[in-house]
A protein has these predicted regions:
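Interfacial aromatic-anchored transmembrane helix boundaries in multi-pass membrane proteins
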Residues: 57-69, 95-137, 141-142
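Membrane-interfacial segments
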Residues: 60, 64, 68, 108, ...
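Individual transmembrane alpha-helices with interfacial aromatic-anchor signatures
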Residues: 123, 127, 195-216
């Protein structure tokens, strides 16, 4: 071994630099592997939530039809998705909900939105998709904001789970009034309820249905989301952030 080589292997500064380079390379590789793992995991979880929404939408689990009213529980998987997958995941889950709602409108699965689709297809597409997409996105943002505040972290699951069905009702009805209130079809409901303004129409139209949806989603989604969030250990950077 030459003196130069011997000096290289015995020089503390050189050895320290080499050690730092090796550790840096290892850390970089580990970080890349973790990000890839969590990205894959995230996509699998998102796909599972989308599948649940689609299954519920085309079975009695998603829509319970009673005389004179239809109750939807699709806000439950949207709320859970928004909480455990973040705002982007919530947006995609909400969009999926909206697309299933549009399918119901086009095929006649929902008598009400089917009638609206025949009146104005473009407005109906907006009505069925935009409010549901915003619902998921906003629920995710609300949960993220509250969960980052330590003093209210524990209740963030419950607040987000309640906000989801409330946002669904508020956004859907606001869009309905903005786009269809002056149509003869909606005016028949206005006359039927005996109301004289859009606000009274919304209250009368939502009624018991909105209350049931809010309560059920609040209870079920908050329990499921908190349990899943804890079990899946969401503590590292991923698309949900």
């Amino acid at each position: 071994m030459s003196e130069r080589q011997a000096g290289y292997y015995t020089n503390p500064t050189i050895l320290s630099d080499e050690k730092e380079n090796i550790m840096s390379n290892i850390e970089t590789k580990n970080t890349a592997m973790v990000k890839k793992t969590f990205t894959t995991k995230y996509m699998v979880e998102l796909a599972a939530m989308i599948a649940i929404i689609i299954i519920m939408a085309f079975t009695p689990l998603g829509y319970i039809k009673l005389p004179g009213l239809t109750i939807t529980f699709l806000t439950i998987p949207v709320a859970v998705g928004a909480i455990i997958l973040g705002p982007v995941g919530g947006l995609i889950c909400g969009l999926t909900f909206g697309l299933t709602s549009l399918y119901q409108a086009v095929t006649g699965g929902s008598v009400f939105t089917f009638a609206l689709f025949n009146l104005n297809p473009v407005f109906t597409i907006i009505l069925t998709i935009v409010p549901r997409t915003l619902e998921g996105l906003l629920t995710g943002l609300i949960f993220k904001a509250l969960h980052n505040i330590k003093s209210v972290q524990k209740i963030s699951y419950y607040v987000a789970s309640l906000c989801c069905p409330l946002l669904n009702t508020l956004l859907f009805m606001s869009t309905l009034v903005a786009l269809f209130y002056r149509t003869d079809f909606i005016q028949t409901y206005v006359a039927k309820f005996g109301v004289g303004n859009p606000f009274s129409f919304v209250v009368a139209f939502v009624g018991t249905q909105g209350a049931i949806e809010a309560v059920v989603c609040f209870v079920v989604a908050s329990i499921l989301a908190r349990t899943l969030y804890a079990c899946l250990l969401y503590t590292s950077p991923s698309p949900r952030d």
